[in-house]
Amino acid sequence: MKSFDSYRKWKYTKFLSNKNYSFNRNYILNIISSKIITDAFNSISKWKNYKKTPLLKLEKLNKNLKLNNIFYKDESKRFHLKSFKALGGAYAVEKISKKKKNIIISSATAGNHGRSVAWGAQRLGLQCKIFVSQYVSEERVKEIEKFGADVIRVKGNYENSLNECKKLSKKNNWNIVQDVSTKNYSYVPLLTMAGYSIMIKEISKQTTHYITHIFLQAGVGGMAAGVVAGVAKYFKR
């Protein structure tokens, strides 16, 4: 068992399975609409240096595991962020900046989401404040600072950094771009999720193979939700 902070311990013992799983396409697209997903692609595909990231076939791993095909979507090639979360935060920044001019962007992050938000603000000439917990490495902080953001380190864990972000954003009238939805905050997270759906749009054009499983890392679940929405939109099987 590894301790990550002063009061919480985590232990990984087994894979978890959702016994109530049901892929309801209409239900999914009622949450993240087909229009929002389409708008995300139409916007991002016009960005400078946009191109599909590679879909690599892992031949050796296929053979060793005796599977038909394993593909790897290499998001490290997305723009110049070297991050698997380049799409969502930057797209949300662009959308909200069209409704409000000369805004200051803020966000709490453990690394990758904040990098996208910072880059999204930089490309539009906006100020950006990124909040991180004391556990975020200096390397990640430097990657965020490369895109011109002010990084505020907060004592405690991610929740503490998020609470501080909310408090100071309200006080200073900053605009929060977060990938976590709450009761009164869902539009911006939906935009963020829609940005990630582009990965599935690209995959649908990069292979004709029947995709049976998709594996991805997930924290708060924004990217995972965006991928599921992309599957509902672009995979018809």
Predicted regions and their residues:
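PLP-dependent amino-acid enzyme catalytic core
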Residues: M1-R237
